[in-house]
């Protein structure tokens, strides 16, 4: 195993180094990309499917830029029968809220045959990704990596000799359109567990790279190496230090990642540096990204497994695998030991232990000491007219046919003006089944005063089934937030004293554990309309999300292409003819 000296090797410079805030404006570039989004035939796991690809490939192309650069993506919709948008996950879109890529929220969907220019600045180095944000297009395969390196003249607060990127996802053989119909049916037809876990879009169905160790038994995968589903092998040299960037764009699953025989040192989370800590395995929820460092200090005559396993749900999907190939060994030389054993799927104490080890690196921005407003969001599973839905404070989100950003900016009455509730009834028991028969659909907006501090308490509860409460990773668009803490049961005022105001991590995605709460804090300093939602694709489709608006009057001229639908489109036409 990696020695403790490895951890100290990184720990000392990470503690001593101050974060640089300088940006080399003169060296910033505009990086242009021309993308066509279309359905293509592909074999992500050995079974040919129709996937949503970009420029004929799956996953989509990796974008690499430097902090301070401008990214310009000319995206053409070649889907023929449906609209499309792309969300740049983790990019705050400061000054460009219309480029956030959320249909009906920040922009109108891009119609078939149309081209939309996403132009935005990547202001902060980190590990990010992008994905579809219209219907369930992420489940259809519309995603890729977005890596932002430090700006010219800057250095990372750690050393490494090389880097790799792993984009994690899950894959169903049932198409995303059929999944949408199933989730909208009465009674509900649940989509079930994915057939395969993918690493960089590659997995193996009905066979295993580690067949001799698999339980239940699976045949050995017979690969030549050129198949679309053949694993992307990580080739390394002995006694080197590598950075592994990892992000999860799963539609459903929470995952555990491990490298056989190697410890990992976590140094980045969601584009923010953290105090380094060593782990044997790590949880990664949908919407999260990390960087870990590992040292190739094991027996150089062997290769090692890299594995991902399902967490938080009963694992009915085989683990995903690839190889850490110590050169000059052949990549066909399989490890002699079985893949790393994952923690039990419902060992939430293990998961909480990992989350509670994440602290901001010294020199990171600190949260304001007090809030101006607290919003407590209770997530429950409900029945509305017989349909199974998720609701927040008894309201299940249904996006309007009109555009939030344009409607608010130009004073168009396009959605429910009644604000959603800031809390839920005090007598609600989060530990018991509750039908919540008074739940409703809604599209109201939380109007947040500009440049104020907001606390969000995510409160989990029992679902419709007895003694069932699920993990939910929540993602905020347009912002990073401070994770102030986690707790068990129902949040109360006395829990405030448990908040970590000294070194809470900055994140854009945070998990809420079963029957527990998570406390977040952010500052409303980015004018726009921003989604805040569970990053599990079926849960968002079933209503688990809210909408925040802040400082919309400060938003500068919105590109007409982002407004060209519904009432904002009519406004454009009216102005054209007047």
Swiss-Prot record:
<feature type="disulfide bond">
    <location>
        <begin position="108"/>
        <end position="565"/>
    </location>
</feature>
<dbReference type="Pfam" id="PF00394">
    <property type="entry name" value="Cu-oxidase"/>
</dbReference>
<feature type="binding site" description="type 2 copper site">
    <location>
        <position position="475"/>
    </location>
    <ligand>
        <name>Cu cation 1</name>
    </ligand>
</feature>
<dbReference type="InterPro" id="IPR001117">
    <property type="entry name" value="Cu-oxidase_2nd"/>
</dbReference>
<dbReference type="InterPro" id="IPR034267">
    <property type="entry name" value="CuRO_3_AAO"/>
</dbReference>
<feature type="binding site" description="type 1 copper site">
    <location>
        <position position="539"/>
    </location>
    <ligand>
        <name>Cu cation 4</name>
    </ligand>
</feature>
<dbReference type="InterPro" id="IPR033138">
    <property type="entry name" value="Cu_oxidase_CS"/>
</dbReference>
<feature type="domain" description="Plastocyanin-like 2">
    <location>
        <begin position="161"/>
        <end position="328"/>
    </location>
</feature>
<feature type="disulfide bond">
    <location>
        <begin position="207"/>
        <end position="221"/>
    </location>
</feature>
<feature type="binding site" description="type 2 copper site">
    <location>
        <position position="87"/>
    </location>
    <ligand>
        <name>Cu cation 1</name>
    </ligand>
</feature>
<protein>
    <recommendedName>
        <fullName>L-ascorbate oxidase</fullName>
        <ecNumber>1.10.3.3</ecNumber>
    </recommendedName>
</protein>
<keyword id="KW-0677">Repeat</keyword>
<keyword id="KW-0560">Oxidoreductase</keyword>
<dbReference type="GO" id="GO:0016491">
    <property type="term" value="F:oxidoreductase activity"/>
</dbReference>
<feature type="binding site" description="type 1 copper site">
    <location>
        <position position="534"/>
    </location>
    <ligand>
        <name>Cu cation 4</name>
    </ligand>
</feature>
<feature type="glycosylation site" description="N-linked (GlcNAc...) asparagine">
    <location>
        <position position="438"/>
    </location>
</feature>
<dbReference type="Pfam" id="PF07732">
    <property type="entry name" value="Cu-oxidase_3"/>
</dbReference>
<feature type="glycosylation site" description="N-linked (GlcNAc...) asparagine">
    <location>
        <position position="349"/>
    </location>
</feature>
<dbReference type="InterPro" id="IPR011707">
    <property type="entry name" value="Cu-oxidase-like_N"/>
</dbReference>
<feature type="binding site" description="type 3 copper site">
    <location>
        <position position="533"/>
    </location>
    <ligand>
        <name>Cu cation 3</name>
    </ligand>
</feature>
<feature type="glycosylation site" description="N-linked (GlcNAc...) asparagine">
    <location>
        <position position="394"/>
    </location>
</feature>
<dbReference type="InterPro" id="IPR017760">
    <property type="entry name" value="L-ascorbate_oxidase_pln"/>
</dbReference>
<feature type="binding site" description="type 3 copper site">
    <location>
        <position position="477"/>
    </location>
    <ligand>
        <name>Cu cation 3</name>
    </ligand>
</feature>
<dbReference type="GO" id="GO:0005576">
    <property type="term" value="C:extracellular region"/>
</dbReference>
<feature type="binding site" description="type 3 copper site">
    <location>
        <position position="89"/>
    </location>
    <ligand>
        <name>Cu cation 2</name>
    </ligand>
</feature>
<feature type="binding site" description="type 3 copper site">
    <location>
        <position position="133"/>
    </location>
    <ligand>
        <name>Cu cation 3</name>
    </ligand>
</feature>
<feature type="binding site" description="type 3 copper site">
    <location>
        <position position="131"/>
    </location>
    <ligand>
        <name>Cu cation 2</name>
    </ligand>
</feature>
<comment type="similarity">
    <text>Belongs to the multicopper oxidase family.</text>
</comment>
<comment type="subunit">
    <text>Dimer.</text>
</comment>
<dbReference type="GO" id="GO:0005507">
    <property type="term" value="F:copper ion binding"/>
</dbReference>
<keyword id="KW-0325">Glycoprotein</keyword>
<feature type="binding site" description="type 1 copper site">
    <location>
        <position position="472"/>
    </location>
    <ligand>
        <name>Cu cation 4</name>
    </ligand>
</feature>
<feature type="binding site" description="type 1 copper site">
    <location>
        <position position="544"/>
    </location>
    <ligand>
        <name>Cu cation 4</name>
    </ligand>
</feature>
<feature type="binding site" description="type 3 copper site">
    <location>
        <position position="535"/>
    </location>
    <ligand>
        <name>Cu cation 2</name>
    </ligand>
</feature>
<feature type="domain" description="Plastocyanin-like 3">
    <location>
        <begin position="372"/>
        <end position="550"/>
    </location>
</feature>
<comment type="function">
    <text>May be involved in a redox system involving ascorbic acid.</text>
</comment>
<dbReference type="Pfam" id="PF07731">
    <property type="entry name" value="Cu-oxidase_2"/>
</dbReference>
<dbReference type="GO" id="GO:0008447">
    <property type="term" value="F:L-ascorbate oxidase activity"/>
</dbReference>
<feature type="domain" description="Plastocyanin-like 1">
    <location>
        <begin position="30"/>
        <end position="149"/>
    </location>
</feature>
<dbReference type="InterPro" id="IPR034259">
    <property type="entry name" value="CuRO_1_AAO"/>
</dbReference>
<keyword id="KW-0479">Metal-binding</keyword>
<feature type="signal peptide">
    <location>
        <begin position="1"/>
        <end position="28"/>
    </location>
</feature>
């Amino acid at each position: 195993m990696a020695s403790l000296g490895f951890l100290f090797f990184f720990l000392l410079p990470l503690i001593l180094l101050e974060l640089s805030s300088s940006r080399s404006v003169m060296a910033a570039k505009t990086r242009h990309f021309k993308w066509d989004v279309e359905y293509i035939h592909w074999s992500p796991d050995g079974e040919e499917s129709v996937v949503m690809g970009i420029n004929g490939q799956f996953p989509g192309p990796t974008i690499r830029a430097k902090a301070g650069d401008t990214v310009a993506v000319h995206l053409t919709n070649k889907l023929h029968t449906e609209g499309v948008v792309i969300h740049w996950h983790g990019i705050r879109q400061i000054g460009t809220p219309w480029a956030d890529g959320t249909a009906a929220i920040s922009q109108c969907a891009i119609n078939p045959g149309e081209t939309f220019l996403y132009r935005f600045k990547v202001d902060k180095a980190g590990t990010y990704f992008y994905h579809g944000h219209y219907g369930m297009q992420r489940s259809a395969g519309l995603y890729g990596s977005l890596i932002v390196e430090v700006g010219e003249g800057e250095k990372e607060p750690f050393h490494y000799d090389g880097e790799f990127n792993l984009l994690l996802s899950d894959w169903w053989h049932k198409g995303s359109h059929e999944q949408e119909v199933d989730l909208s049916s009465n009674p509900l037809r649940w989509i079930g567990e994915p057939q395969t876990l993918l690493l960089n879009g590659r997995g193996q169905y009905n066979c295993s790279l580690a067949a001799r160790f698999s339980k239940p038994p699976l045949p050995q995968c017979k690969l030549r190496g050129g198949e679309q589903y053949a694993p992307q092998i990580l080739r390394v040299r002995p006694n080197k230090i590598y950075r592994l960037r990892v992000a999860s764009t799963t539609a459903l699953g929470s995952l555990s990642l491990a490298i056989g025989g190697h410890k990992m040192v976590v140094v980045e989370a969601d584009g923010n540096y953290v105090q380094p800590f060593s782990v044997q395995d790590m949880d990664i929820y949908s919407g999260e990204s990390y960087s870990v460092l590992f040292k190739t200090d094991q027996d150089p005559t062997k290769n090692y497994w890299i594995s991902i396993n399902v967490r938080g749900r009963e694992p009915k999907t085989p683990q995903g695998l690839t190889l850490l190939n110590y050169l000059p060994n052949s990549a066909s030389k399989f490890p002699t030991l079985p893949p790393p054993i994952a923690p039990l799927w419902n060992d939430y104490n293990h998961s909480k232990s990992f989350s509670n080890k994440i602290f901001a690196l010294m020199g990171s921005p600190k949260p304001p000491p007090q809030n101006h407003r607290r919003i407590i969001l209770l997530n429950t599973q409900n029945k509305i007219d017989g349909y199974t839905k998720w609701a927040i404070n008894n309201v299940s989100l249904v996006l309007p046919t009109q555009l939030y950003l344009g409607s608010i900016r130009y004073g168009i009455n396009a959605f429910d003006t009644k604000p959603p509730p800031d809390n839920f009834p005090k007598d609600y028991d989060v530990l018991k089944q509750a039908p919540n028969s008074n739940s409703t659909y809604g599209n109201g907006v939380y109007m947040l005063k500009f440049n104020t501090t907001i606390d969000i308490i995510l409160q989990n509860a029992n679902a419709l089934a007895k003694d069932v409460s699920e993990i939910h990773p929540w993602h905020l668009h347009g912002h990073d937030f401070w994770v102030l803490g986690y707790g068990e049961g129902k949040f109360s005022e006395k829990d405030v004293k448990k908040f970590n105001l000294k070194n809470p991590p900055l994140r854009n995605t945070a998990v809420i554990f079963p029957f527990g709460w998570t406390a977040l804090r952010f500052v409303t300093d980015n004018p726009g309309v921003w989604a805040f939602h569970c990053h599990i694709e079926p849960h968002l489709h079933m209503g688990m999300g809210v909408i925040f608006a802040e400082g919309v009057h400060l938003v500068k001229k919105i590109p007409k292409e982002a407004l060209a639908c519904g009432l904002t489109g009519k406004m454009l036409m009216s102005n054209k003819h007047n």
